[in-house]
Amino acid sequence: MKVVKFGGSSMADANQYRKVRDILLADTQRRVVVVSAAGKRFGADHKITDLLYLCHAHTQYGVDCSNIFEMIRSRYLEIRDQLGVELDLETEFAALKSGLDRKMVSQDELASRGEYFSAKLMAAYLGFAFVDAADWVRFKYDGTVDQTATYELLKQLDKGIGMFIPGFYGRMPDGKIRTFSRGGSDITGALAAAALNADVYENWTDVSGILMADPRIVDNPATIPEVTYDELRELSYSGAQVLHEGTIFPVREKNIPLNIRNTNDPTDPGTLIKESFATDSDPNRFITGITGKKDFSIISLTKRGLSGEVGCLRRVLSIFERHNISIDYVPNGIDNLSIVVSTEAIAQSLYTIMADIQKELQPDSLTVHDQIAVVAAVGRKMAFRPGISGKIFATLGEAGVNIRMINQGPDELNIIFGVDNKDFKTAIRVLYDSFVK
């Protein structure tokens, strides 16, 4: 059995609904389907979820949102009518608007209605059952998912027939609707796959899998055919926008493969994500992907005898902890130590942190460098290929890119280096050309 999730681009209009129908009918194993709210139909269009949040904000400030609400309502009615589906949506929309006008609908509840109406409409279109996410996704009071209750409830609701589930939300212990953060329909699908011990979790979107580099930087980057969960974690952490970060844990825990596919090109196999692979689809490729993010700061301290000073690293890290600052990387040498953090995250407390470091560690020098970009080359096979690091540094040197920081984990799953913001795109392009083309 397969659990299948379709994103907003796959729910954008009646034509996309028909594509989803064809994909589901092509494989009877695809019987548990999670859907997002309708996404953009074209560049200047609006995502339904954005309109729902906007509508709620208007209401809270006493501004009439009737025009926005009508945009949402007419979008779903248009899809319904174009598909020829007999489903009374008017009554539900009227009740929702009435509750909204009386300020009886919370922001989370209103934001969740895009997924709700998508699932209702698709279920009626294909003759599947509709299973409300509020009937099985359970949150704890701290906002985390109660996996035990969630899994048990879905098992009870599963009758072995086709069903559509709205993504993105669940219910709190007090009965109120709560949403995940944006993109959370990915998590709903992962929870469903884990609860029902699916053979695979298919995530359908508008791209054919995970790309080896950002297409806004590299022209027509290749698709990654296979990637491990560890590699995906590294790619996502280092900047690749792949899946919602909470998606991986439920399926990985149950050792369920995750397949990212393209609704607009359903024959493309996309990217398969697993714990490990016995064989390799491309044994000559040693880098899985190249990604990165801009706007970091490097705080560096130097002190003679630092390596022999017990508790030095702990004291530095505790300073950042006191200021609730998440640290991204900690490259170090014998007598020097650097802390790499997001410039935005540290902006309000930089000088206080610098003063605390100066007071508690009394370094010989203490400097901060901003306008830094972090680039990561990720690949599970790099550890078995001598010379990868040398090739990376030589490639960047030939392109005139100065390396400001280097960091590599003991498992050699990635090589991370800092460059100036201005060299960010150049670094990714030349590395892609060197290792992939």
Model regions and ranges:
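Internal nucleotide-binding/catalytic subdomain
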Residues: V200-E202, P257-I260, D265, S276
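Positions that flank functional sites
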Residues: W136-R138, S208-I210, P266, D335, ...
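A structural preference for short, hydrophobic beta-strand core positions in alpha/beta folds
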Residues: F130-D132, I260, Y329, M405
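A conserved regulatory-domain signal marking ACT and ACT-like small-molecule sensing domains
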Residues: P269-K437
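Short glycine/serine/threonine/alanine-rich loop segments
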Residues: F128, A198, I256, I325, ...
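Nucleotide/pyrophosphate-binding catalytic subdomain
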Residues: M1-L243, I248, S342, G418-D420
